[in-house]
Amino acid sequence: MPEIIIVKNEAEAGEIYGRCVADLIKAKPDAVLGLATGSSPLAAYQALAKIVKDEAIDVSGVRGFALDEYIGLPLTHPESYHATIHRTVVEPLGLDPAKVHVPGDVLNGTPLEDGDKVALAGPAYDRAIEAAGGIDVQILGIGTDGHVGFNEPGSSLASGTRVKTLAEQTRIDNARFFDNDINQVPTHCITQGIGTIMKARHLVLLAFGAGKAEAIEETVEGGVSAFCPASALQMHPHATIIVDEEAASRLRHKDYYRYAYTHKPAWQGI
């Protein structure tokens, strides 16, 4: 069962994540971070960047692997996840760009039709993560339908990094990054699979707003099912879900989650 932390706002959630990762980097200077895009992690990255600066933490050895990437967008496209990760994580934290990887880096706009090259990129990415020693902390967002990464409902809970077709709802949700024009949103992606994500040593999922309440209810208190990919976190030995009051509004056991978090010993961390 994941630890559930209910916070006032995104800033408080960001502070919790930032402290967790900053302490990790101090203890393990070559830590491997799992990185996600979207709006949910932004406050977390900002909090971490502030701690790194304020405490003069050396991040020169830190490595990173992003969750996913659109297929067909060149790396230079502003909404490619390569560009987004560099804009929101690499530059603010001062990470070495050569040590931060995105699944589509080797594709760089390769069209879906180039099946041989596209199909090989997923297994190669999983091997790269394994060669780095695995991911220490993986940050996650969650879609309104319970997807994590680009693992849409129905994705295998044992899947590795591979090519997926984006659900129409995901394309609608992401159109806000493409001038609200769904026709500009790619139809396919390459994403870490649920099986790949579950190999990370610590998972931290963030969710904010009433629009995520149903997905959080299914993730935390529903059954484990491929139709809510995030529900796989119930099976992870070290998963933390940080939500605001609105995202937690449908949880039946909120009082217990609050009690458990406020009464845990400080040495446990998150």
Swiss-Prot record:
GO cellular component, one term: cytoplasm
Superkingdom of this protein's organism: Bacteria
Pathway, per record: Amino-sugar metabolism; N-acetylneuraminate degradation; D-fructose 6-phosphate from N-acetylneuraminate: step 5/5
CDD domains assigned to the protein according to its UniProt record, in alphabetical order: GlcN6P_deaminase
Catalytic activity: alpha-D-glucosamine 6-phosphate + H2O = beta-D-fructose 6-phosphate + NH4(+)
Active-site residue numbers: D68 (proton acceptor), D145 (for ring-opening step), H147 (proton acceptor), E152 (for ring-opening step)
Enzyme Commission number(s) from the entry: 3.5.99.6
GO MF, one example: identical protein binding
Top-level EC class as recorded in UniProt: hydrolase
Annotated PANTHER family: GLUCOSAMINE-6-PHOSPHATE ISOMERASE
NCBIfam families in UniProt: nagB, PRK00443.1-4
Similarity section: Belongs to the glucosamine/galactosamine-6-phosphate isomerase family. NagB subfamily.
Chain's role: Catalyzes the reversible isomerization-deamination of glucosamine 6-phosphate (GlcN6P) to form fructose 6-phosphate (Fru6P) and ammonium ion.
Identification of the protein by name: Glucosamine-6-phosphate deaminase
